[in-house]
Amino acid sequence: PTLDRAIVWLSYSVHGNEAAGAESSMGVIYDLVDPNNKEAQEWLKNTIVLIDPSVNPDGYSRYTSWYRGVATTSRDIKPDVREHREPWPGGRTNHYMFDLNRDWAWQTQVESQQRIVKYHQWMPHIHADLHEQWFDNPYYFAPAAQPFHAYITEWQSDFQTEIGKNHAKYFDQNGWLYFTREVFDLLYPSYGDTYPTFNGSVGMTYEQGGHSKGGAAILLPNSDTLTLYDRVAHHRTTSLSTIEIASKSTDRLVQQFTDYF
């Protein structure tokens, strides 16, 4: 049968101590199933959305268990207090201390092996890999930084820019800081953006400031306060924006994906 729908796969918190991803996934699911959200209901008429809320459940559990044990009942925003200083081994890796965001192509870990089976059953047109970076950085989204691998097509590169412009619209409306085309490249083949790209998808990394340092709230160098609520709101916004642009571009996504192969 001819596919007439766009397929979007959203992956959250492959580094388990980047908890805003997993937390925001719940809000994204709520937005999509809310019958009163008419815009989302329209998107779902021509778009299939797959959500992996915790790509690294070992690391996420390790981080959240530690945090619940040390966090104060009244959040302490000072960056040097214990709840902002995650100890070794931390939640970045899985149980075997392997970084799952280096394992997409090699599939040495059981989480990667099982995920890739499902990934190839669906073969999404868009894959977004939602991360966190150092707590005082503004939000990062596509287009990616150079270098691009030579096998990445002009279409894949150009559509990243379209998606980024859609995100920028919402960030500008809310006065949220962001940057593009810096730091996060598309060269190494085993990231959560490059492996999907080499399989015909438009693969992207999104990076929210926070990381394990963020906690429930943290004081920034500019004397502002970054809260978990803020971090979740930003990831939720780019997730929904990704689905929106996919829905508006279904025919092109399907055709370009077909042409790729």
What are these regions (language model features)?
Residues 101, 106-261:
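C-terminal accessory segments enriched in acidic
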Residues 12-15, 86-91, 162-170:
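A broad, low-specificity signal for short, low-complexity segments enriched in glycine/proline
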Residues 5-20:
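Short HxH-centered metal-ligating active-site micro-motif
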Residues 25-32, 239-242:
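Buried hydrophobic packing segments
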Residues 21-28, 40-43, 47, 96, ...:
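Stable alpha-helical elements in mature extracytoplasmic
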Residues 1-5, 24-28, 41-107, 131-150, ...:
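Surface-exposed loop and adjacent secondary-structure segments within mature catalytic domains
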Residues 9, 33, 47, 53, ...:
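Hydrophobic, aliphatic-enriched repeat segments that assemble into extended interaction scaffolds
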